[in-house]
Amino acid sequence: MAKRIGKILLGIFAAFLVLIVGYVAYMQIQYYRIDDFTKLATENPQTEQVQKGKAYRIMTYNIGFGAYSADYSFFMDTGEMLDGTKTVGKHARALSEKAERENTEGSLNLVKSQEADFIFTQEVDEKADRSYQVNQREIFQKGLSGYGSVFANNFHSAYLFYPFLEPHGAVQAGMLTFSKYQILENTRRQFPVSDAFITKFTDLDRCFLVSRLPVDGGKELVLIQVHLSAYDKGGLIRAEQLALLNEVLAREREQGNYVIAGGDFNHDIAESIESFPSGQKTPEWVYQLDSDDLADGYRFAKAENAAEIPTCRGADIPYEKDVTYTVVVDGFIVSDNIEAKAENIDGGFLYSDHNPVVMEFTLL
């Protein structure tokens, strides 16, 4: 009897081991990184050209794949309350398909209300289990039908069977750049990313999207949408990413182009680490960047209301004003031949764990 039980247990263990090895092999076979310098087409291309001396509006907004209503927390986020209580997020997917659609439409309406000429959006799901297969890319492109758009995939993962009771699933997601003006060319540039065994399967395929727009007089307006790494202990990968971005910024300035780089920097870009009331300690992932960290001739266009309105909340707990940790990580870098004035928009974190940022600018 004991031998029979032992054989059964051994068989169960062997089956489990085969399952694990098979799953790891599946993840490895499915794993890939998109090539650097990948050219991307503009959908619904526009024809009007950008002009010097004219005022324009640009917006950036991380829509958080439609999951982050105020009552949402994310399983990968951790934190600590001021009293030392450890916190960890709960969910790997949106709360429901209904909530997913409501948040996506809410974010779209918030974007449309700002009447921007150019729009950067991050964490836009195209086909993902975490968002119940709701195609946010299609919804935004249809809702912003008067714009040309380009999509850069920066998250393509095989089915992640974790957490076990609510698997994150497979994901195809990325960044969308919208423009009411003519785009000559789009190039997806690959950021350095971690190749650690587990991290490479779960982290984004980080990139930045470079879009070139003709300007009267022969120069170009170069729009660069970015989404830098957040989960990087020691900041080594983020330092490499910033170095590459600065290399590109410097090259464009040497050519006399107008440059705006914007998006989710996942760094404090407004000296806001301790600006807002909070019942939580400052998270480990919050690093500070300022204009001194940028290539010569560039600056962060700090929002005039950056001390009053944060752009990102911690997602380790549901959002509660003055309790959940908040900081400014979204915004724009501008070259010194651009006059710019930015404003953080108070969206109340109703549809995303981010608030939008809008910037008015003029090419000098």
Task: Tell where the protein language model's regions lie, with residue ranges.
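Conserved beta strand-loop-helix elements of the APE1-like EEP
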Residues: 142-145, 170-186, 213-216, 320-339, ...
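Surface-exposed cleft-lining segments at the edges of enzyme active sites
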Residues: 90-96, 124-128, 191-200, 227-236
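Active-site beta-strand/loop signature of hydrolases that rely on acidic residues for catalysis
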Residues: 57-63, 90-93, 103-133, 178, ...
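Metal-dependent phosphoesterases centered on the DNase I-like endonuclease/exonuclease/phosphatase
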Residues: 232-336
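A well-ordered secondary-structure block
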Residues: 37, 156-220
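Short proline/glycine-enriched turn/loop segments at secondary-structure junctions
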Residues: 198-200, 318-323, 346-350
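N-terminal, active-site-proximal structural segment of metallo-dependent hydrolase catalytic domains
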Residues: 3-142, 153-162, 166-172
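Solvent-exposed loop/turn segments at secondary-structure junctions
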Residues: 63-66, 124-128, 154-158, 183-184, ...
